[in-house]
Amino acid sequence: MAEPLLQLTRVTRRFPAGDKDVVVLDDVSLSIDAGEIVAIVGASGSGKSTLMNILGCLDHPSSGSYRVGARETSELESDELARLRREHFGFIFQRYHLLPHLSAAENVEMPAVYAGSAQAQRRERALMLLARLGLSDRAGHRPSQLSGGQQQRVSIARALMNGGEVILADEPTGALDSKSGHDVIRVLRELNALGHTVIIVTHDENVAAHARRIIEISDGRIVGDRLNPHADGADAASGASGDAGPQRARRLSAGVGRFAEAFRMAWIALVSHRLRTLLTMLGIIIGITSVVSIVAIGEGAKRYMLDEIGSIGTNTINVYPGADWGDSRADAIQTLVPADAAALADQIYVDSATPETSRSLLLRYRNIDVNALVSGVGERFFQVRGMKMAQGIAFGPDEVRRQAQVAVIDENTRRKLFGANPNPLGEVILIDNLPCIVIGVTAAKKSAFGDTKNLNVWVPYTTASGRLFGQRHLDSITVRVRDGQPSAAAEQSLTKLMLQRHGRKDFFTYNMDSVVKTVEKTGQSLTLLLSLIAVISLVVGGIGVMNIMLVSVTERTREIGIRMAVGARQADIMQQFLVEAVTVCLMGGAIGIVLSLGMSFVFSLFVDQWKMVFSAGSIVSAFLCSTLIGVVFGFMPARNASRLDPIDALARD
C-alpha cells in the first residue's frame, strides 16, 4: 500500500491565553492520499483553519507528528519548511491575499521568484495560467481593477505557479457571489482531475458536497470522516500533477532574480510613499552633504595653504649662523660664507643653493626716498623661492661674478618709486648711494599670510658684500632639495657636510618640510573634527531610516505573511527590507553628493582664494557610508520582518 501524501498522527495544537493554554486541535489523526479532493467542514472556531495551516506548513503542531511524504516536518528548519510550501503547496485564501501594488501576472509570478525561476520562463507560465483561467486580458490589471471572482482565479493561478501538488483552499467561495463561487469550485475539480490533491476548508455543506471525501471537525476533534457518494466523478488516479512548475534557473541567476525582485519591491514601496521617503532621506542627505563638503573644503584649504607655502619656497632648507633662533652670539659668527653655498649646490640631493645677506637701506629715485630691504642673493634665488618675473629678467651668474650694479625690485617698490610709470626697466636707482640699473620686476602674489607692504630689492650677493654691506660672510643659505629626494635625509646630509667644513656646530637648519607637514596635519585634524560632527547627522538620519523601516514592517505585515505563504525564506524577507533601507540611503547619498557639488559653485562665488576640491575617494566613501548606514540601521527592521510568524502576519489587516 502506497504511503499517504499527508499524514497527521495524534496532533495537538495549543495557544497560550494568559496563564492557560487553549487547545485548538486535540489528538487529531488524519491521512490524505495523493490525488484526493477532500473537504474539511466545521463551524467557526472548530479548528479547521488551524488544521489547514498545519497541513500547509504555515503552522506546526504543539505535539504529535505531521509527515509530508516521507519527511517529518518537526525536524525541518524554517527554510526547509519554506521550500515545502514553495514546491508542494499552493494556497487559495478567502480574502485572496493579492499584493495590491502588483499586477495580476506579477502576483502569479511571485512563488516562482522565490523558487529561482528565470524571469522569461515565469512570465510565460504566469500568462499561460491566467489564460487557462480566462484572465488573459486582465494580466496587467491590479487587484483593485478586478472583481472578486477574478481575484480568486488569480489566487488559484498563483497556487499553481510552482506546480501546486497540493492545493489548500480556505473558504474559497466565502467572499464570492454564487456564480463566481460555482466557477471556482469547477476550477478546483478540474485541477483535481489533472492530478492535484485538493483540500477545501469550508463551513458550507454545499461546497463540501463537491468533494469525494468529507472530514468533519468540531471543537478541535475529527468527528466524521466519510466518502461522499453523491460527488460527481472520481478522485484523480495519480497523485502526480501533470502541470509542473517552471524550470529553475541556475543558482547565480536565481539569486540575481530574487535581488532584482527585492529591489523592484523596494522601489514600489518608496514611490508609493514619496513624502515619507523624502523625509526619511533628509537626514542622510544632510549628513552626506556635510561630510563631502567639509572634506572638499578642507582639501581645498590645505592645497591653497601648501601653494602659499610654495610661494616662499617649498622643499627648501635654510641654513643660519648660531645655535638656534634667538642665539645672542649669532651676529658674531662669520663662518657662513659663499663657498659653503657652492659646496652645497654640488651635492646630488640639491637642486640649487643660493647665498643670502640683507640690510635695510635707503632707496632714491629722482626726488623720492624710501627705505627698503635690500638682499644680496645668488642667481638661483628666484628659482629656489619660486618667484616669477612680471617684467624683465633676473640677473645671472655673469652679473654675480662681475659684482654688477643691477637690481630686481618687487611690485611695491615699483609703485613707490615709479608711480604711474608701468615700465621701470633700464631706470637707475640709488641704493645707499650705489647706482643700480633696474633689470626686472617680480610678479605680485596674493598670500594667505596677508598682503605685505614691504619694499624689496635684490642685487647679486657679490655686489651687496663688496659694494654695499662691506662684509664677506652670509646671513643665510637657502637650499632647494631635488624633487624626489626625502627632505629629512637631505637635511641630515647637509648638516654632516657643514660640520665637516666648519669643524663645529656653529649653524642651525630650518626645514620648510616641517611647515608643510604641520599644515597637512592641522588640516587633517580639523577636517576629521568637522567630519565627526557631520557624521552625527548621518547617525541621526540612520535612526530615522530605522524608525521608518520599523513602521514599514508593521504596515506590510500581511504582505510579509503572503510572501512566506508562497515560499519566501527568512533570508528573502530580510533581503527585501535590507535592500529597501540601502536604497533609501543610497538615494539620499546621491542627492547629498549632487548638493555638495552645487555648493562648490555657490562657495566659489563668495570665496575666491581657494576652491572646494572633490576626490573620487571621498565620493566613493560617501556611497559606501550610505550603504553601511542602510545595512546597519536597516538590519533590525529586516530581522524583525523575517522572524514574523506566517499565520500571525496573514491575520493582520
Swiss-Prot record:
Keywords: Antibiotic resistance, ATP-binding, Cell inner membrane, Cell membrane, Membrane, Nucleotide-binding, Translocase, Transmembrane, Transmembrane helix, Transport. It holds the Pfam family ABC_tran. The chain crosses the membrane at residues 278-298, 526-546, 587-607, 616-636. Its EC number is 7.6.2.-. GO terms for cellular component: plasma membrane. GO terms for biological process: response to antibiotic. CDD domains: ABC_MJ0796_LolCDE_FtsE. It is found in: Cell inner membrane. Its main location: membrane. Homodimer. Non-canonical ABC transporter that contains transmembrane domains (TMD), which form a pore in the inner membrane, and an ATP-binding domain (NBD), which is responsible for energy generation. Confers resistance against macrolides. This is Macrolide export ATP-binding/permease protein MacB. It comes from Burkholderia thailandensis (strain ATCC 700388 / DSM 13276 / CCUG 48851 / CIP 106301 / E264). The lineage of its organism: Bacteria, Pseudomonadati, Pseudomonadota, Betaproteobacteria, Burkholderiales.
